[in-house]
From Swiss-Prot:
Glycans are attached at residues 220, 335. Mn(2+) binds at residues 196, 289. Coiled coil: none annotated. Interacts with SLC35A2 (isoform 2; UGT1). Its main location: Golgi. It comes from Homo sapiens. This is Beta-1,4-galactosyltransferase 4. The chain crosses the membrane at residues 13-38.
Length: 344
């Protein structure tokens, strides 16, 4: 009886001891787990913060990239620029260099300029026929670039240079300028510009209108009066479509004179009117020069003028043959050099 009681107590004691040990082990393991978990909370917070920061940075980069690739749409420039000054006193420095003109026009690149603050209403190509008139070209570039920029134009200046050895053909050079310029840009408007004429008033807008426009109402050499009734030379403006419609200039005027009157007749044959600015606006200074060798008066000009109505469809842009020697994009202008075969 005593033995059984002792055994029974011993068994209960061992069972209790075993249970206590189990609870102790479980408690120890649980406490270690919670301590470890508590210690890991700051690390987890740091990880999540860094992850969130990376996510925000990633989104920011995406937004930045999208913003950089998205094209900003500018408003149209006003029909009358706020930068216009009106009549200007022109100064022609005898020691002017091309480097000076370039330094004065830092925003012109490869002969092109467009306003940054608005979208220009027209893309305008200025075509200047040229041979052996370097000083005149410098004076024109010095004054014409700021003049055009104040008018908020998207423009390019093309100087079409005739290679030596042939009689000068201004009209054919202008046909070449039109054809070659359109290979670079779908220009809206073309200004056919003599190298020795410099505009005095920037309200004389170098834009195209519903009808062809004659810009030289007067010049200093004629007392600022129109040279003669019907005069259509010096500086004229025709849209891409207008010039194409008249088949451009005739290619047959070798030497000086007649090609401007020929163009006027072509315009009139298409029942287009000619507009001009007000006399006080369409004023130009002609830089003095003597007649160039190779640009003598064309003795055939009157005979050619009598043929315009018969030949204008076949003589012009449609028949303009030439050898393209080079196209050079200088800082202030695009130089196009061509060679003609005399009589072609």
């Amino acid at each position: 009886m005593g033995f059984n009681l002792t055994f029974h107590l011993s068994y209960k004691f061992r069972l209790l001891l075993l249970l206590t040990l189990c609870l102790t082990v479980v408690g120890w393991a649980t406490s270690n787990y919670f301590v470890g978990a508590i210690q890991e909370i700051p690390k987890a917070k740091e990880f999540m913060a860094n992850f969130h920061k990376t996510l925000i940075l990633g989104k920011g980069k995406t937004l930045t990239n999208e913003a950089s690739t998205k094209k900003v749409e500018l408003d149209n420039c006003p029909s009358v620029s706020p930068y216009l000054r009106g009549q200007s006193k022109l100064i022609f420095k005898p020691d002017l260099t091309l480097e000076e003109v370039q330094a004065e026009n830092p925003k012109v690149s490869r002969g092109r300029y467009r306003p940054q603050e608005c979208k220009a209403l027209q893309r305008v190509a200025i075509l200047v026929p040229h041979r052996n008139r370097e000083k005149h070209l410098m004076y024109l570039l010095e004054h014409l670039h700021p003049f055009l920029q104040r008018q908020q134009l998207d423009y390019g200046i093309y100087v079409i240079h005739q290679a030596e050895g042939k009689k000068f053909n201004r009209a054919k050079l202008l046909n070449v300028g039109y054809l070659e310029a359109l290979k670079e840009e779908n220009w809206d408007c073309f200004i056919f510009h003599d190298v020795d004429l410099v505009p005095e008033n920037d309200f004389n807008l170098y834009k195209c209108e519903e009808h062809p426009k004659h810009l030289v109402v007067g010049r200093n050499s004629t007392g600022y009066r129109l040279r003669y009734s019907g005069y259509f030379g010096g500086v004229t403006a025709l849209s891409r479509e207008q010039f194409f419609k008249v088949n451009g200039f005739s290619n047959n005027y070798w030497g000086w004179g007649g090609e401007d009157d020929d163009l006027r007749l072509r315009v009139e044959l298409q029942r287009m009117k000619i507009s001009r600015p007000l006399p006080e606006v369409g004023k130009y200074t002609m830089v003095f020069h003597t007649r160039d060798k190779g640009n003598e008066v064309n003795a055939e000009r009157m005979k050619l003028l009598h043929q315009v109505s018969r030949v204008w469809r076949t003589d012009g842009l449609s028949s303009c043959s030439y050898k393209l020697v080079s196209v050079e994009h200088n800082p202030l202008y695009i130089n196009i050099t061509v060679d003609f075969w005399f009589g072609a």
